[in-house]
């Protein structure tokens, strides 16, 4: 029997509650198709609300502190660390990636074989990227068995919604309209795949705040404007003269955008009597200081579909990012990775008992200097957050309803 292909779709910034829920405003027939023909884990916890940290944990099956990604500053994943991508290569898989350039900045695509493994962060599925992906799937360049890591950046803020999805029927916010737009391309992509011989995994690196709330029967929407999105794209067009210089310029432009947006938001909501949650959603950024371990930022979807995955199954037990590749390893009977903290979720899919494991979480590196390292532990029933160099507990949520 030939080895199955593996397609890992990572939708940057996709929250679990915005694609796996009964009350969605987005139109997502293709994500729904994957769920109907697979198993979904809506309570999947990311290690951190930052691409570099989260993807490093996914690819290694290890928490950030075991792979050198728990520092207060951003840096690259060491090429000496064993990843599941290397294991797949050593077991006959051709490894391909289509990922934003931020993945290259942080050493996430070192083990992929194709020379066009990254694209500029500003490039959308609707700017030709979608067609490039489909061309790879149909032109025979992906020699079987293949592992294809596809990282979609269209939902990353600031969002530019394509005109064809700007109608309110596609979503109650820019964020939700963009999910509808991305779903359109997911449909075009899976049309080109043999689902009987391909394992599809759809997840996100982290979630995001969606600054849209209902207040006194009115909608307050503080999502980034189209002009802000244009400025962000301009910043990402800066050529990589050197990785460090380009990153520094991009950080400065990003900081300018965040500061400007924060001032505008503050002026608009200062006089409103908002709850702490409403203030956080409207005012805070995923890139600001603080622990940034609220569920809006770290709870992501996880869907296994295709191949012989049990159909239309929803498993509510909490699972973790670091469990994704141990599950793939188990499904495909690959040699076991020696150094791993994640565990296979296959027993849950087979209706067997698997004890819930606590999820280690941490704040991502801050864009500001002198930020403090904050860590946490999350289960279904509690979340504990503390400063790494202190015994002082910063936050403690003690029951299921208050874990946020």
What are these regions (language model features)?
Residues 1-404:
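Catalytic domains that recognize anionic headgroups
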């Amino acid at each position: 029997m030939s080895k199955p292909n593996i397609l890992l779709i990572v939708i940057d910034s996709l929250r679990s509650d915005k694609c796996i829920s009964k009350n969605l405003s987005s139109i997502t027939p293709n994500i729904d198709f994957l769920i109907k023909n697979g198993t979904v884990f809506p309570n999947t916890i990311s290690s951190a609300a930052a691409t570099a940290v989260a993807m490093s944990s996914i690819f290694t099956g290890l928490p950030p502190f075991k792979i050198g990604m728990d520092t207060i500053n951003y840096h690259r994943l060491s090429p000496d660390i064993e990843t599941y991508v290397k294991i797949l290569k050593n077991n006959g898989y051709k490894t391909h990636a289509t990922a934003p350039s931020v993945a290259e900045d942080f050493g996430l695509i070192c083990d992929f074989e194709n020379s066009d493994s990254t694209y500029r962060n500003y490039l959308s599925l609707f700017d030709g990227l979608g067609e490039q992906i489909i061309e790879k799937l149909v032109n025979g360049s992906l020699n079987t068995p293949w592992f294809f890591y596809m990282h979609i950046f269209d939902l990353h803020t600031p969002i530019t919604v394509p005109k064809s999805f700007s109608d309110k029927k596609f979503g109650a916010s820019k964020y939700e309209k963009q999910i509808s737009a991305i779903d359109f391309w997911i449909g075009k992509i899976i049309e080109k795949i043999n689902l009987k011989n391909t394992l599809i995994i759809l997840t996100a690196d982290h979630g995001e705040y969606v600054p849209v709330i209902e207040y006194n029967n009115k909608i307050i929407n503080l999502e980034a404007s189209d002009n802000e999105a244009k400025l962000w794209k301009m910043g990402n067009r800066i050529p990589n003269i050197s990785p460090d210089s380009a990153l520094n310029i991009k950080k400065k432009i990003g900081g300018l955008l965040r500061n400007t947006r924060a001032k505008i938001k503050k002026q608009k909501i200062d006089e409103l009597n908002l709850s702490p949650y409403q203030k956080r959603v409207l005012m805070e950024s995923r890139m600001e200081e603080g622990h940034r371990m609220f569920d809006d930022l770290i709870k992501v979807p996880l869907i296994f579909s295709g191949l012989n995955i049990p159909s239309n199954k929803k498993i509510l037990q909490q699972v973790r990012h670091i469990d994704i590749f141990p599950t793939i390893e188990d499904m495909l009977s690959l040699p076991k990775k020696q150094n791993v903290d994640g565990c296979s979720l296959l027993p849950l899919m087979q209706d067997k008992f698997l004890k819930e494991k606590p999820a280690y979480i941490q704040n991502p590196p801050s864009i500001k200097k002198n930020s403090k390292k904050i860590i946490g532990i999350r289960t279904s029933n509690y979340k504990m957050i503390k400063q790494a160099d202190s015994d002082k507990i910063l936050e403690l949520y003690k029951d299921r309803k208050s874990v946020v």
